[in-house]
Amino acid sequence: MTDMPTLDAIRQAPKALLHDHLDGGLRPETVLDIAGQVGYDGLPSTDAGELASWFRTQSHSGSLERYLEPFSHTVAVMQTPEALYRVAYECVEDLAADAVVYAEIRFAPELHINRGLTFDEIVDAVLAGFAAGERACAGAGCPIKVRLLVTAMRHAAMSREIAELAIRFRDKGVVGFDIAGAEAGYPPSRHLDAFEYMRDNNARFTIHAGEAFGLPSIHEAIAFCGADRLGHGVRIVDDIEVGLDGDVKLGRLAAILRDKRIPLELCPSSNVQTGAVASIAEHPFDLLARSRFRVTVNTDNRLMSDTSMSQEMYRLVETFGYGWSDIQRFTINAMKSAFIAFDERLEIIDEVIKPRFAVLIG
């Protein structure tokens, strides 16, 4: 096989996914089906193809705030245990079909209480869906491990409660905590109590930072909050200078981010949709990769971006000319950065990822 991977070949490659929102990855048919079952009549279309196109078009908004608006529809159909279970199960199926071997999926339980569910009931339903999906995929010959991150919305005041939820379920499939939502006006430091609680319990967390807002958000996430990873972090490019001779000079913040090997959960297609970057070609992914930051490739929201891990990888291959060794490096970066135990990470790298890439590389 040549060193320039095709999309079909990339679909065979093992992948590790760290940044994917459960409520951003539903199948359009499932949105319609559940909407009919629960009596939700707010959808813009009753045709699956048209609905998928609508989500993609609406999400290509140029701002994070407008990008988040279509989620009102997916969240509306995820308010019962049955719906949450189904969406979680299908998420596992869809990822396994794309050769994802490890994934951390995140969602905000506080958005799913409209029909009276408790946080524990919500998380139980999602974890049950994941577990059933894993069993089904293993039986079908495409094993996958899926774990959960619970997210608190940064504009709300529930982050400590959600952090406590993460710890309650830490031995049942929840491997970490996150904050998400509009960055401007809602700095990570508003949630210090939640992050301190996670650290006090020796637990891991990531923070959406440097997506729509700049370096101050990244600085707070690292220096004040102690984030283990950064969700997006794309604006770290504002602290990097590239000279006319191509020489790269890192600012103090960029340098410590690289030196501490803090993983960047980069989501190329999503970053274009939200206006964080103008195009894939102008995305700093390649600059960061060449500068040896811990870069990872992610989908963010598969429905909204009409994407998959294979498609995200292929867009980078097309744009930056990456080969198999690059894709393998990005995949191992992600697996090294996962919130599961070291021996579990090593097992997946040594027994799944490296052997399968060896076959692809030839």
UniProtKB/Swiss-Prot annotation:
Entry superkingdom: Bacteria
Listed cofactors: Zn(2+)
Cofactor binding note: Binds 1 zinc ion per subunit.
RNA-binding as UniProt keyword: no
Chain residues that bind substrate: H21, D23, G181
Active site (record annotation): E211
InterPro entries in the record: A_deaminase, A_deaminase_dom, Ado/ade_deaminase, Metal_Hydrolase
Coiled-coil ranges (or none): none
EC class: hydrolase
Gene Ontology cellular component terms for the protein in this record: cytosol
GO molecular function per UniProt: 2'-deoxyadenosine deaminase activity; adenosine deaminase activity; zinc ion binding
Gene Ontology BP, a term: inosine biosynthetic process
Name of one Pfam family that matches: A_deaminase
EC number: 3.5.4.4
Keywords, sorted A to Z: Hydrolase, Metal-binding, Nucleotide metabolism, Zinc
Residue positions binding Zn(2+): H19, H21, H208, D300
Reaction catalysis annotation: adenosine + H2O + H(+) = inosine + NH4(+); 2'-deoxyadenosine + H2O + H(+) = 2'-deoxyinosine + NH4(+)
Family statement: Belongs to the metallo-dependent hydrolases superfamily. Adenosine and AMP deaminases family. Adenosine deaminase subfamily.
Protein purpose: Catalyzes the hydrolytic deamination of adenosine and 2-deoxyadenosine.
Entry-linked HAMAP family: A_deaminase
NCBIfam families membership: aden_deam, PRK09358.1-2
Protein name: Adenosine deaminase
Organism of this sequence: Mycobacterium ulcerans (strain Agy99)
Gene coding for it: add
